[in-house]
Swiss-Prot record:
GO terms for cellular component: ribonucleoprotein complex; ribosome. The keyword RNA-binding applies. It comes from Methanocaldococcus jannaschii (strain ATCC 43067 / DSM 2661 / JAL-1 / JCM 10045 / NBRC 100440) (Methanococcus jannaschii). Belongs to the eukaryotic ribosomal protein eL20 family. The gene is rpl18a. This is Large ribosomal subunit protein eL20.
Length: 76
């Protein structure tokens, strides 16, 4: 059974201010959710893994999901 994880952290790009983020992913383990985050940020923002600092990874209940797309997947 897949779980939902909320990952918070800081992403920094050269010459720009750091960006704080909070993302939610559906995965089996926290490591899988982290790998999805690295893959997404690398492709979308061209950020290397070493420039992403993870502050917290927590498992959340389906009621606590804030991402509208993930919420539809969970409640369907």
């Amino acid at each position: 059974m897949a779980k939902i994880f909320r990952i918070t952290g800081i992403m920094s790009k050269k010459g720009k201010d750091p960006l704080y983020f909070r993302k939610e992913y559906k995965a089996l383990k926290p490591e899988d959710a982290l790998e999805i985050l690295y893959s997404e940020f690398g492709g979308r923002y061209k950020v290397k893994r070493s420039r992403i600092k993870i502050l917290n990874i927590e498992e959340i209940k389906p009621e606590d999901v804030t991402d509208p797309v993930l919420k539809k997947l969970v409640t369907a």
